[in-house]
């Protein structure tokens, strides 16, 4: 596992965006051989999306031959609802880049048969071979995507019941009213994430410190699903200073020394 200990959330976004651009450009994608990118929603990736849009407008990267798969979507929330993940992705990213509409993949939380929808999503991912890079965030309780504590580390895309803690945390997007936050969501599984060639998790804020500590210094544990990344051959944690507050000083120092070159010129 790589840990990139940066200073601010803006630094995290810039580093993540630069890494994605480097990966896409090195891959040299084409219509016949697209780059497959997994994407999250929420507060953590906002700075990364801003930086990606800026780099695209500067001519540093094209998304014309990039296919995206999003991590999750609420069940029962209309696609055009201001807090749907469809709306989030288009407003914050897709509307500002040259990605082809047919290359955007988001789970349908209004599907009549959610089990069939999850199966379709898994099959479509497999039709491309694999996701080359999956960017994600992490919840206060260590969940990735909507794989809440005690999720199977072998799980695939499925419907999940959201914990009260997650709904309370997400109520800030619904005017602070927990009752407006959907109780269910469709989400890629832990196993789906682990199948990706590379997984990059963005960790920002003091409220994520316990999750980061569990991921880096703890044992692999289904109560902290983020810890599954210890099993991945190419996992990266990109974090700001507040999120490292629960890590041992020597842990942060160790990774800072290892990643000195990669953290330059942000």
Swiss-Prot record:
BP terms from Gene Ontology: carbohydrate metabolic process; glucosamine catabolic process; N-acetylglucosamine catabolic process; N-acetylneuraminate catabolic process
Pfam family for this entry, one: Glucosamine_iso
UniProt-listed InterPro entries: Glc/Gal-6P_isomerase, Glucosamine6P_isomerase, Glucosamine6P_isomerase_CS, NagB/RpiA_transferase-like
GO cellular component: cytoplasm
Keyword field: Allosteric enzyme, Carbohydrate metabolism, Hydrolase
Inhibition and activation profile: Allosterically activated by N-acetylglucosamine 6-phosphate (GlcNAc6P).
Reaction it catalyzes: alpha-D-glucosamine 6-phosphate + H2O = beta-D-fructose 6-phosphate + NH4(+)
Stretches of the chain forming a coiled coil according to its record: none
Site keyed Part of the allosteric site: positions: 151, 158, 160-161, 254
GO MF annotations, alphabetized: glucosamine-6-phosphate deaminase activity; identical protein binding
CDD domains per record: GlcN6P_deaminase
Active site, renumbered: 72 (proton acceptor), 141 (for ring-opening step), 143 (proton acceptor), 148 (for ring-opening step)
EC identifiers of the protein: 3.5.99.6
Pathway assigned to this chain's UniProt record: Amino-sugar metabolism; N-acetylneuraminate degradation; D-fructose 6-phosphate from N-acetylneuraminate: step 5/5
Assembly: Homohexamer.
Record-stated family: Belongs to the glucosamine/galactosamine-6-phosphate isomerase family. NagB subfamily.
Function of the molecule: Catalyzes the reversible isomerization-deamination of glucosamine 6-phosphate (GlcN6P) to form fructose 6-phosphate (Fru6P) and ammonium ion.
NCBIfam families registered for this protein in UniProt: nagB, PRK00443.1-5
Record-given protein name: Glucosamine-6-phosphate deaminase
Protein species of origin: Pectobacterium atrosepticum (strain SCRI 1043 / ATCC BAA-672) (Erwinia carotovora subsp. atroseptica)
Originating gene: nagB
